[in-house]
Amino acid sequence: MHDKILILDFGSQVTQLIARRVRDGRVYSEIHPYDCDPELIRKFIQEQGGKGIILSGGPSSVTEEGSPRAPQIVFELGVPVLGICYGMQTMATQLGGAVASAESLGKAREFGYSEVRAHGHTNLLKGIQDFSTSEGHGILKVWMSHGDSVTTLPSSFKLMASTESCPIAGMADEERSFYAFQFHPEVTHTIQGTAIIERFVHEICKCKPDWVMGDYIAEAVENIRKQVGDEEVILGLSGGVDSSVAAALIHRAIGDQLTCVFVDHGLLRLNEGDMVMEMFARNLGVKVIRVDAKETFMGELAGVSDPEAKRKIIGKEFVEIFQAESGKIKNAKWLAQGTIYPDVIESAGKGKKGAHTIKSHHNVGGLPEDMHLKLLEPLRELFKDEVRELGVALGLPREMVYRHPFPGPGLGVRILGEVKAEFASLLQRADAIFIEELRNTIDEVSQKSWYDLTSQAFAVFLPVKSVGVMGDGRTYEYVVALRAVQTQDFMTAHWAHLPHELLGKVFNRIINEVRGINRVVYDISGKPPATIEWE
């Protein structure tokens, strides 16, 4: 039995990052809502290999009546507990400390980078720091996101970290191995965050690092076979990483019981339809049905500008096509999708208590209630980098596994406002030029292409026209935005600092080769506050 960590979710949009950091250390983790049955927690710890518990952040305030609390059993099972942000506040409140809102303290809410003084006398932080001051104090560069603060430590706790604006930024009860931080060690903005979480998991909880992707494959294959039995599965294939890996995993489990349906909705990347068919016929050997649905999708999207409405229309059309195709396949009872963790967390409003909805994804937010197929989502607990690792372990070619992510709604959410065939054609050509130049431009330091150095890159069509000059004439044409980001987990991201020469070449090619576009801009927004996709 593998050692495990239980994560109780209080509604944070980055709870899954905690699980990712734990898994980075080759320890299995599970996420459950904070108000799950206490018996589940007891069994997880006492019967299923659980070695520790982490309490996530969340949007609530412990100072408000009826706010979430951790089940009391968490503090009675004799295992280490780590509280993060809201998790720290509820731990302090439940164990006898005090918490106050920023307003009551006459302070502003704290959001963004901060420097925390680490008190290194605790087992958790000893020796972990980014730099030290002239007085010898260890300093951590961290990410804060809170309004409330702990003002009084519980009687058995001591101070573990502090800032000027947050005097109690960390606390510890070493005897019971209870620890808590006001900052977020799970996000990449906290430089030593991974080291802190791995210290907690490996040294405090004493978990053995023995969970590997091979174990996940074996478990997933067994689960798929149990779920599906002798029934057949239909999978919507886009050619992207997620659906490709899902197809490979399901095919390994049930072979020819899987039929992939590739829906060409006219919103794919340039020439992608032909490439998808060739790739899967050559590499996977699975049954693939190609459906030309361009006119259907364009007709349904005509006049629709709202991004949520577009996503739901696209999701609905996908499902209806799958249902029509499944009627032609004997014993087809399941619809498989490449839903992954970030899809689920960003669609938090659909079943996640306390979380704030950001956007819905076509995989999880646009499905009709009367869907006639059961849902199979074998990747829904994996992050993007884990999906890639799984793809390699399944034997998929690198060019398939490391292709940049592409949204299920395709260019439908990269064309802002109403979707038209004319706009899709312009965007396809501009995007192809951008990706081609990223692949062809090598960074002198790393000797890698800028395509490999970016996690996701694409063009966005803006439904506005700008004045330009070409030759001796005035132009009044459309604008395209370029977006390129670097990220480890797609939950947070930094904009990519592409060479100006590369951006200049992309601009020149788009302006000269794509008639109808006369202006190109580059998006330098990070996530947060922006999302990676524009819609």
Curated annotation (Swiss-Prot):
Pathway listed: Purine metabolism; GMP biosynthesis; GMP from XMP (L-Gln route): step 1/1
Query: So where's the catalytic machinery, residue-wise?
Result: C85, H184, E186
GO MF assignments: ATP binding; GMP synthase activity
Q: Which reaction does it catalyse?
A: XMP + L-glutamine + ATP + H2O = GMP + L-glutamate + AMP + diphosphate + 2 H(+)
Q: Where does this protein hold ATP?
A: S238, G239, G240, V241, D242, S243, S244
Enzyme class of the recorded protein, top EC level: ligase
Question: How does this polypeptide assemble, per the annotation?
Answer: Homodimer.
Q: HAMAP family annotated for this entry?
A: GMP_synthase (MF_00344)
Q: What does this protein do?
A: Catalyzes the synthesis of GMP from XMP.
Q: What is this protein called?
A: GMP synthase [glutamine-hydrolyzing]
Q: Give the species this sequence originates from.
A: Polynucleobacter necessarius subsp. necessarius (strain STIR1)
